[in-house]
Amino acid sequence: MMNLKPLTFLPFFSRLVFLSGVIYNTAWANTVIPVDNSRPDETFSRTSPKQHLFSQKPKPAEPTSSASSQQISLTIEQLASRPDLVLRALIPALKNNDMRGVEILLPIYAKQSPDPFLLKWAQAVVARKQGKLNESVRLYRQIIAEKPNLQPARLQLAIALTQNRENEAAKAQLNQLRSENLPAPLLTLIDSYIDAINQRDSWNVYGGVNYLHENNVNNAPPKGTKVEGFTPSSQPEKAHGLSYFINFSKNWSLAHGFFTEFSADINGKYYWDNHKYDEFSTRLNLGGGYRNAKTEVKLMPFVEQFWYVGGENATKDARTLHRYSKSSGINLDVDYWLTPNWKMSTVLEYTEQRYIQPQRQNSNGNSYSVSNTLIYMPNSQQFWFVGLDYYQKNTQLKAYAFERQGIRLGWGQEWSKGISTRLQTSYATRTYQAPSAEKNTIFAPSFFKVVQKNREYGVNFTIWHRSVHWLGITPKITWAYQKTTSNNPFSEYDRNRIYLTFSKNF
């Protein structure tokens, strides 16, 4: 694996061009334009970008003096009178990332009834060459939204994102490219580039805001529930507001792939029409690990504080946040690419939790969680995943302690016309350690005297448009449905939520 500590882009592109199937030794000196005069496909949409970009054997150039030469040289003035030749020169220049050639051809092509898609691609290339990275990224995202299988443009987007210091977004594009059927040398090069991104030690900031529309913010059973003459103490409550989150993180690279990391997470909810459910939390993480292009192992001790107005236990007009609980623990996170198409992600966490209010201290205890997810990416436009989860909460009062086992299934897709979707379904069982009431308790329903067992169902569907950006922010609409059935009727509920998410990497 090559040493890419000083992240440079010229060597990277020189290797890409070497591997490219359509290579043109263009000098572009003295405004003389070499033109590939071989017969192209009739329409650009019928070309196969992946085939051209990732073919391993470059086509040998024929002598320009030969009568059968496939390349001719024209001045800009001569080329301007031949729109067909402009197009034949522009397409390979775009696919081969020939920024100088595209910069020369763009003004000519723009005056010749240009194809809007090719014009936008050329503008993206020129914007990147001129250092207008925000504009270039915006145009490339629109291009990928329209043609998600256009791998040369996706690769150019990844480079533009890296140059613009949008490291996580760049890695996401490179990982999508790895799922394609690429030659081994190019896969190695992409891995090396991911390694180089990993060695950047700049601060990363990620945050977002969700609009919340809650019909059952307190997870109460349906209105009118009555069993054995008993009615639940709570009724479903509505709430509208915002949730927000922000993450700050910084890595310090050490030798041989090791690193230390600090991160801070801030999360909260604010309901303008039901403040008693407002909440706020902070979590600080400090640890380290090891990573390369295929593997990342990270061990992060953490401390966390949680503030809450009080929920159902608070007065109707309450709105002051109070310290509710504090936690500390350790998190182990392992990501490993089994192949270019298969990835395994495992997270283990141990937590000690203590409640501040005396009446809640019988819930003090610890918890263990394990989450294992297998991801399959057949290509850069699609992924599937299956996950298994285990969570165990131990408390002083056994009626509050439980064990939860779950499974998740998901599918993500980049569609044509710029639409992207993500679907996740989940199922879990939750079994408590002890009944809520003793068997000889008189004033308690019978279902309080047996161990509670729940079945939990969930569906999440998110949709967004990849080319819709404002200041680097992509809005996403999510519908979330949760349903719980139980042998305790007072713990049964269903919950529909629709929220609009605005998030951004800074």
What are these regions (language model features)?
Residues 30-75, 83, 90-96, 103-107, ...:
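Gram-negative and organellar
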